[in-house]
Design a protein with these regions (language model features):
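Switch/coupling sub-region of P-loop NTPases
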Residues: 100-102, 109-146
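Conserved glycine(s) of the Walker
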Residues: 83
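A conserved segment at the C-terminal end of the G1
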Residues: 86-96
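Conserved ATPase "switch" residues in P-loop NTPase domains
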Residues: 67, 96, 141
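Post-Walker A helix-loop "phosphate-sensing" segment adjacent to the P-loop in P-loop NTPases
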Residues: 94-104
Length: 146
């Protein structure tokens, strides 16, 4: 099974579940498990192990400029499947290569996996590493992210 016991329990309680998992040598996947017509349904999206560069994604130069900013809020919005997670992963990777900082993500679920390059990258998953987004955001400043 790709589900942990805790995830199985959450699915039984909530009748739906967002989660991610990886198959070695193949890919990572984001999945949404749900009930429909008395049966279980699931939708999977592939998450590549390799994070694409700005050039490969066709992102405008202004996105690279945003990654140089020492502070601020950047909103990446769009419909499902439009590339929000891929864009954010590319931005995190760019920062990870170009800077020497502490990157902290709060995700539901963790999608792209980031290795430490020039930054320390801590990825927290809601309901696995923290009880809620609110709790994670509240304690984030104590974890000294840049």
């Amino acid at each position: 099974s790709v589900l942990t016991d805790a995830q199985k329990h959450r699915f039984e309680e909530n009748l739906e579940l967002d989660f991610s998992f990886g198959l070695k040598g193949l890919s990572r996947f984001r999945a949404n498990l749900f009930n429909q017509k008395g049966a279980v349904g699931c939708v999977f999206r592939a998450i590549p192990y390799e994070i694409k560069t700005f050039d490969a994604l066709g992102l405008p130069p202004v996105v690279a400029d945003l990654c140089k900013k020492p502070r601020g809020l950047i909103l990446v919005t769009g419909p499902t499947g439009s590339g929000k997670s891929t864009t954010l992963a590319s931005m995190i990777d760019k920062i990870n290569i170009d800077r020497h900082d502490h990157i902290l993500t709060i995700e539901d679920p963790i999608e792209f996996l980031h290795n430490h390059k020039n930054c320390v990258v801590n990825q927290r998953e809601v309901l696995a590493d923290t009880h809620s987004f609110a709790d994670a955001v509240r304690t984030a400043l104590r974890q000294d992210p840049d």
